[in-house]
């Protein structure tokens, strides 16, 4: 009667193949995560620019941080910092409301906005 099962060589080959697949997939996954974080920072920067433009018109001049963050969508404001509802993205505003720093997942972008 012949024993059923896998030989040690067959198991070793499968483990090597799985190791190669993991070595290829993990760096790509990390790169995709970085790209997603950068895309989120860029989208948030565009939203801050729009909010700043609206607040500038409403304030008839340079707006305050509170005016720029007046209607946070899906997040909360504490002082001069807006945080997304899942705590993954933050937007900080300086006292004169002309510099905004956006951060998410190690990616950061600074906006210097002025009123013309």
UniProtKB/Swiss-Prot annotation:
Removed propeptide positions: 1-5
Native organism: Thermus thermophilus (strain ATCC BAA-163 / DSM 7039 / HB27)
Chain positions with N-methylphenylalanine modification: 6
PROSITE patterns linked: PROKAR_NTER_METHYL
GO cellular component: cell outer membrane; periplasmic space; plasma membrane
Residues passing through the membrane, by range: 6-26
Keyword Transmembrane part of the UniProt annotation: yes
Functional description taken from the UniProt entry: Plays an essential role in forming the main structure of the narrow T4P pili that participates in twitching motility.
NCBIfam families cross-referenced by the UniProt entry: IV_pilin_GFxxxE
PANTHER family (UniProt xref): GENERAL SECRETION PATHWAY PROTEIN G, TYPE II SECRETION SYSTEM CORE PROTEIN G
Post-translational modification: Glycosylated.
Gene that encodes it: pilA5
Name of the protein: Type IV narrow pilus major component PilA5
Pfam families (UniProt xref): N_methyl (PF07963)
